[in-house]
UniProtKB/Swiss-Prot annotation:
The keyword Plastid does not apply. Component of a yeast aminoacyl-tRNA synthase (aaRS) complex formed by methionyl-tRNA synthase MES1, glutamyl-tRNA synthase GUS1 and the tRNA aminoacylation cofactor ARC1 in a stoichiometric complex. Interacts (via N-ter) with MES1 (via N-ter) and GUS1 (via N-ter). Can also form a stable binary complex with either MES1 or GUS1 that is functional in terms of aminoacylation. CDD domains: GST_C_Arc1p_N_like (cd10304), tRNA_bind_EMAP-II_like (cd02799). This is tRNA-aminoacylation cofactor ARC1. It comes from the Eukaryota. GO terms for molecular function: enzyme activator activity; phosphatidylinositol-3,5-bisphosphate binding; phosphatidylinositol-3-phosphate binding; tRNA binding. Residues 186-199 have a biased composition (Low complexity). One of its GO terms (cellular component) is cytoplasm. The lineage of its organism: Eukaryota, Fungi, Dikarya, Ascomycota, Saccharomycotina. One of its GO terms (biological process) is glutamyl-tRNA aminoacylation. It comes from Saccharomyces cerevisiae (strain ATCC 204508 / S288c).
């Protein structure tokens, strides 16, 4: 067993439960076969393509032993390619996704400075253009056949009509029909627009957001972004912990990010943050001077449901639609009261203008010292 594999197996991140799908198992077997053949260099383009669409090789949220085995062979190859290249920028452009992955893995595994690939993060690479597949005509062959029949029918009808210029009476009738159709269409459009304007938009409810207690198992600094931490957080998913990028470097030392309970927003759309896909967000309270974690009550467990009072029985959305701006509409109502409890404050709600963030036991969630905080 190599030193890198041994080092990986000593990390907490290697102990996460892994349950591969059939597709992921096939991917792992494919790369194992490539490694056994000793011919990984011809597969570098394929590896770069895989890492373009995934953070790690087997489409997981965190590295697996497959990443370590492939990394061990790919690192010296890429080092040689970069060192011998007459056009380093071109090499970086060609293998940009492998380089991002190598940078993360070598920092995770604490590769020695002699073996480490020194990556130029200031190199200005051209924008990557990804070709989109052309959509096939809807309906395929059936539509093509129907169109052919329609063309034949039109041709036959055309031949049935006598050739030559229509008389004036016919032209007048056609003009009147066209005018009437245009007026009817305009009236229908105006009616539809008026109905849409009169229809009040449905107000999103805070129950749409999937708040959960999370446990940060491990956090490291993002290899490509000085302001970001990359945390592995257990939020109770059967698939295992999530990878979460947080811009908290300026506010918390790395030690404060280890093995602690937090509140996590779990249904925002995943976002790529400097090459690493972030699949959730840590909830914090802040003012102009400082940032503080929203602290779960004592004896909380990873995966515990968190909600605002009155919405405990409602299920959150699977994923918030960014186009509908649900988070942007609700978040400004999140704040803290004088007792430092996180609340949802909406003065338009006459019956319940204030709702506390709570759990199934009715306990409060607080920040350490900031009243009237922005919570996000």
């Amino acid at each position: 067993m190599s030193d890198l594999v041994t080092k990986f197996e000593s990390l907490i991140i290697s102990k996460y439960p892994v349950s591969f799908t059939k597709e992921q198992s096939a991917q792992a077997a494919q790369w194992e076969s490539v490694l056994k053949s000793g011919q990984i260099q011809p597969h570098l383009d394929q590896l770069n393509l895989v890492l373009r669409d995934n953070t790690f090789i087997v489409s997981t949220l965190y590295p697996t032993s497959t990443d370590v085995h492939v990394f061990e062979v790919a690192l010296p190859l890429i080092k040689d390619l970069v060192a011998s290249s007459k056009d380093v920028k071109s090499t970086y452009t060609t293998y940009r996704h492998i380089l991002r992955w190598i940078d993360y893995m070598q920092n995770l595994l604490e590769v020695s400075s002699t073996d480490k690939l020194e990556i130029n993060h200031d190199l200005d690479l051209p924008h990557e253009v990804i070709e989109k597949k052309k959509k096939a005509p809807a309906g395929g062959a059936a539509d093509a056949a129907a169109k052919a029949d329609e063309d034949v029918s039109k041709k036959a009808k055309k031949q049935d009509h006598p050739r030559g210029k229509p008389d004036e009476e016919t032209l007048k009738k056609l003009r009147e029909e066209a005018k009437a159709k245009k007026a009817a269409k305009k009236a229908a459009n105006a009616k539809q627009q008026q109905e849409q304007q009169n229809k009040a938009p449905e107000k999103p409810k805070p129950s749409a957001i999937d708040f959960r207690v999370g446990f940060i198992q491990k956090a490291i600094k993002h290899p490509d972004a000085d302001s970001l931490y990359v945390s592995t957080i257990d939020v109770g998913d059967e698939e295992g912990p999530r990878t979460v990028c947080s811009g908290l470097v300026k506010h918390f030392p790395l030690d404060a990010m280890q093995e602690r309970y937090v509140v996590v927003v779990c249904n925002l759309k995943p976002v790529n943050m400097r090459g690493i896909k972030s699949t959730a967000m840590v909830l914090c309270g802040s003012n102009d001077d400082k940032v503080e974690f929203v602290e779960p009550p004592k004896d909380s467990k990873a995966g515990d449901k968190v909600f605002f009072e009155g919405f405990g029985d409602e299920a959150p959305m699977k994923q918030l639609n960014p186009k509908k701006k649900i988070w942007e509409h609700l978040q400004p109502h999140f704040t803290t009261n004088d007792g430092l409890e996180v609340i949802f404050k909406d003065e338009e709600e006459k019956d319940h203008p204030v709702r506390k963030l709570t759990n199934a036991k009715g306990e409060s969630f607080k920040v350490a010292s900031i009243a009237n905080a922005q919570v996000r």
